[in-house]
Structures are given as structure tokens and as C-alpha cells.
A protein has these predicted regions:
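Alpha-helical membrane-targeting segments
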Residues: 58, 223-226
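Hydrophobic residues on conserved beta-strands that form the core of alpha/beta folds
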Residues: 29-31, 45-48, 144, 157
Length: 226
């Protein structure tokens, strides 16, 4: 009986390993439609998040091809495009951003990995500053607790960057709409409010602040609420 149980556990473990390997080497396109009378005209957005320096094909050729087929009006990046480990670098993320910036407007808000490399300079040196400088030079717009107004669409696009303590796994912090307002100010009246916020745990607070549509990431496999 014990041998059967061990064999079952082994088969189950191998199954999940195979699934993980397959999942880490593919991407899925999911489409969502949002309508609001405040929007002046249709807008197609592609969101990228949590690639952690992953390449799908040489220099992300498969991913870039899929994005071009979508023909977006702009691209939103919601953080963690590289991994904050000392032996890691940002080349794959840089090359992808460079290629996309040639054809599209790109708006980028940091994830916790970008924040870590920016704040812990003793460990990472100028990695973040070099990365951001290169991307800004490509025309990519970084939004760190600031916003831009997209006049053609009547959209106010905000990039929220919260303190890293809000990413703690076992001691969840309370954020609150008031704290979001301290970061971003009062939302612009009359426009449609889009927010790039890497951490999805605080959707209720983002909505209470005034966000109409939030682009998040961080949890990779999705968020489950019981």
C-alpha cells in the first residue's frame, strides 16, 4: 500500500513539474472589453507584466509577433520585467522594450523587483538607474506615482508605486484609499481613470480612490479570493 502511495505521489509530482515547464515556456492572450461614455474613441491596449527577463523565441520574437498582430494603440507595462537577483541582468527586458518602443507608445510602472534594485544600491549598484535611463531614452514613459492625460481618449493614466512593505507575504499590510490618494493625489474629474498598479491585492482600495480600470501583475498564476 505504501509503495502504491509513493508511486502516486511521484507521478503527481512529475505531472506538476511538466505542467510548470510547459507553462513557463508559453504565453496566452486574453482579451477584455471595457466600455465607458467618458472615452472619446476606441483604444486598444496590450499589457505586459512579470516576464522576469523571459524570452519567448530569440529576442522575444514570438511575443513581439503576437503583439504586432494585436495592433495596439499603446502598451502598458505593469512591472517585474526583470528579476532582482545579483547574478541577473536586464538585457532581455531592454531588448524587448527597445523593439516595442519603435512602434508603440509604452507606459511603464515599476514592480517590486524594479523597486528593490533601485533601493538596494549596495547590492545592485546602478542597475536600475542604467535600465531606466536606457528605456527613457527610447521614449518609454515611466509613471512613478504620477500620471499623464491622454487627450485623444480623455483618459488619465496613473502609475502607482507603493512601499515594498505592502508586498509582504505573511503579514499583509492595510493600504486604504486615503493612502492611495497620498501617493497619487485626487483623481482628475471628468476623465476615465486608468491605473497601473503592480500589486493586485488592493483592488478595493484602488476602486475606492477612483480607479475605473486597473492593470496589475505580481501574482503570476492569478489571484484567488475565498
Amino acid at each position: 500500500m505504501m509503495k502504491i502511495l509513493l508511486a502516486f505521489i511521484l507521478i503527481l509530482a512529475l505531472f506538476f513539474i511538466v505542467v510548470m515547464v510547459i507553462d513557463c515556456n508559453r504565453f496566452v492572450i486574453r482579451e477584455y472589453r471595457c466600455e465607458d461614455k467618458r472615452l472619446k474613441k476606441p483604444l486598444k491596449i496590450v499589457q505586459l507584466s512579470d516576464l522576469h527577463n523571459k524570452s519567448f523565441g530569440k529576442d522575444n520574437s514570438r511575443l513581439i509577433h503576437a503583439i504586432r498582430e494585436q495592433n495596439p494603440d499603446l502598451i502598458i507595462v505593469s512591472g517585474d520585467m526583470y528579476t532582482s537577483l545579483p547574478e541577473k541582468e536586464t538585457i532581455a527586458a531592454q531588448k524587448l522594450m527597445e523593439e516595442l518602443a519603435k512602434s508603440y507608445s509604452v507606459y511603464y510602472a515599476n514592480g517590486n523587483h524594479e523597486q528593490k534594485t533601485r533601493e538596494e544600491t549596495e547590492e545592485f549598484g546602478s542597475l536600475y538607474e542604467d535600465y531606466r535611463k536606457k528605456l527613457s531614452g527610447m521614449g518609454i514613459h515611466f509613471l512613478s506615482n504620477e500620471h499623464v492625460y491622454l487627450k485623444d481618449y480623455n483618459i488619465s493614466l496613473y502609475g502607482l508605486e507603493i512601499h515594498r512593505r505592502y508586498y509582504r507575504k505573511f503579514r499583509k499590510q492595510i493600504l486604504g484609499a486615503d493612502r492611495v490618494q497620498e501617493y497619487l493625489g485626487v483623481p482628475d474629474p471628468g476623465s476615465f481613470h486608468m491605473m497601473i498598479a503592480h500589486n493586485p491585492d488592493f483592488f478595493e482600495d484602488y476602486a475606492a480612490w477612483g480607479a475605473d480600470l486597473v492593470f496589475a501583475g505580481h501574482v503570476h498564476g492569478g489571484l484567488m479570493r475565498l
